[in-house]
Amino acid sequence: MRKIYATGKRKTAIAKVWLTPGKGGLSINEQSLNQWLGGHEAIKMKVMQPLLLTKQEQSVDIKAVVFGGGYSAQAEALRHGISKALNAYDIAFRAILKPKGLLTRDSRVVERKKYGKRKARRSPQFSKR
């Protein structure tokens, strides 16, 4: 029984994922998916997407530790980590996950604030006279 480790990232959220062959258990920060997310069905589907695409929701156990960012970023980091772990588990899953963009790190992060500006791009109000 081999244990596969993968890391997923999105914005400032990081997900550490351990995947083992099992019966479909999903533990996030020592909680079930429903406890961790509450009633956010769209975000739950985002997390389950790689498992549903590869039809592994009943044949692998996943234990994850997620920190940083908000719920949406954490869910996308978790999805990225699960996808990378499934890819390491069976290379045949790459053909399913890659076209959906699940193995690609989303590199969009918050743009830094520049000096002389109020925010990243917002300038102070201009007065002609």
UniProtKB/Swiss-Prot annotation:
GO terms for molecular function: RNA binding; structural constituent of ribosome. GO terms for biological process: translation. InterPro entries: Ribosomal_Su5_D2-typ_SF, Ribosomal_uS9, Ribosomal_uS9_bac/plastid, Ribosomal_uS9_CS, Ribsml_uS5_D2-typ_fold_subgr. It comes from the Bacteria. One of its GO terms (cellular component) is cytosolic small ribosomal subunit. The keyword Ribonucleoprotein applies. Keywords: Ribonucleoprotein, Ribosomal protein. Belongs to the universal ribosomal protein uS9 family. This is Small ribosomal subunit protein uS9.
